[in-house]
Curated annotation (Swiss-Prot):
Any one GO molecular function term: DNA binding
Name the record gives this protein: DNA-directed RNA polymerase subunit Rpo6
Entry's family note: Belongs to the archaeal Rpo6/eukaryotic RPB6 RNA polymerase subunit family.
Location in the cell: Cytoplasm
Record flagged with keyword DNA-binding: no
Native source species: Methanothrix thermoacetophila (strain DSM 6194 / JCM 14653 / NBRC 101360 / PT) (Methanosaeta thermophila)
Gene, per the UniProt record: rpo6
């Protein structure tokens, strides 16, 4: 994920999906004292460790 540019909609979708995964019991990929899934997902996004990819259509 590092070095890639995401639209604000892609970022929102990625963070939301990751927060849901964390809420449902997925392992947290960073060390943190926070228990809020959204805060954890945002920090993971900032650090570039979220294991989610974005597939885009080729530009025409």
């Amino acid at each position: 994920m590092k070095g890639e540019k995401y639209t604000r909609f892609e970022r929102a979708r990625i963070v939301g999906a990751r927060a849901l995964q964390i809420f449902m019991g997925a392992p947290v990929l960073i060390r943190t004292d926070s228990i809020d899934p959204l805060e954890i997902a945002l920090e993971e996004m900032r650090l570039g460790v979220i294991p989610i990819t974005v597939k885009r259509d080729r530009k025409r």
